Amino acid sequence: MDLIPNLAVETWLLLAVSLILLYLYGTRTHGLFKKLGIPGPTPLPFLGNALSFRKGYWTFDMECYKKYRKVWGIYDCQQPMLAITDPDMIKTVLVKECYSVFTNRRPFGPVGFMKNAISIAEDEEWKRIRSLLSPTFTSGKLKEMVPIIAQYGDVLVRNLRREAETGKPVTLKHVFGAYSMDVITSTSFGVSIDSLNNPQDPFVENTKKLLRFNPLDPFVLSIKVFPFLTPILEALNITVFPRKVISFLTKSVKQIKEGRLKETQKHRVDFLQLMIDSQNSKDSETHKALSDLELMAQSIIFIFAGYETTSSVLSFIIYELATHPDVQQKVQKEIDTVLPNKAPPTYDTVLQLEYLDMVVNETLRLFPVAMRLERVCKKDVEINGMFIPKGVVVMIPSYVLHHDPKYWTEPEKFLPERFSKKNKDNIDPYIYTPFGSGPRNCIGMRFALVNMKLALVRVLQNFSFKPCKETQIPLKLRFGGLLLTEKPIVLKAESRDETVSGA
């Protein structure tokens, strides 16, 4: 029996031509960096270097930096990406040429009306939305939001005490994930939830579904391999965000907004109310006010941007304090001095906690949750003698720069003193970029820092943390869109009044 089908010569020829054309399509961008004389790892047809990302962006970027040093070119499937590590070049990309060339973040497939969200919007639309939202994140507005956040700090302490009193070690992501969820749903949607004790709440269920995003998901990969699918999927109303979840959240925002507009009494200050106010503000005459669809997109993106990042960083901070008891005691002493007798923290008192600020900054250096910053090159440009073609994504490997011995003595060590007043001025702002830099940095940076510090103060006023036999030391990281641990961080929590866990 013939193993090879008896096909006509024309059929074989057609098949061969089809395979050649398919190969050419799958490698059409892969010669760019070689042509430009930029080194980098060899890409595979269609997938580029994407399979190497499975070991973790941080590992792959570290390997490339050690091998190629200053710049290198990689391919995320079909997308050429230029990694840069020179602080002058980084400043040019993030600041000097932000508005003219490097305005936009990298698009990631069909997003539907979420294209209006501040972290996804492009060019003039992004500038307009950023201008409208910036007043929402002023220190004055954040100060007014502190009572809402503080309320969930108290819930966090109660939940942590309940977990600790079982005598079992505490899984930090469990309690900090609930805190992060509560604060974000409260400030973005005006919804009060104790999510740890109400896991069936539709807001909790839907927001958790929204956050299950995997960069190596077959659907996401197919869009990267065949980018022409994006407009087709957009036309079919298929997006990377789960349809049912988006439908639930948009309906919720609409109902909450309508309810608030009907009420006559003064509303509490949260992001949702501030955005509603901006729609009716006379000050918005210079820019077209936020539409209802844009308002919904911001509320949803706040969850996407804030939930995982806040809960992960809080977990990393407490882990570092547990494994460095001298630092933990020093932080607690500072908190007890500024806020005696467990006095509730305020916006102003949190800003007085200099050593706590050093601890937070050092943890963000060791664990920059986003790992990379990315900007799309809008037109052919030359920067510091290097030609960058239109369409290339310029990538700044934050994790690599945060761990580079060229800039940090003993970079793998947890040393909060790096960020003391004396040393802080020596830190290059284009090497240390936990929230990005320039006009398109993280708009919620101040909110995130205040939110985390309020939680840390309440927790450290009431508890001390120690490693236990289940604690993974040193921490191992796993692949994900953000910096995640291989195993959940588990610690022993002890009440500062009396030992309540695992003693």
From Swiss-Prot:
Expressed in fetal liver (at protein level). Heme binds at C442. It comes from the Eukaryota. Keywords: Endoplasmic reticulum, Heme, Iron, Lipid biosynthesis, Lipid metabolism, Membrane, Metal-binding, Microsome, Monooxygenase, Oxidoreductase, Steroid biosynthesis. PROSITE patterns: CYTOCHROME_P450. This is Cytochrome P450 3A7. Its cofactor is heme.
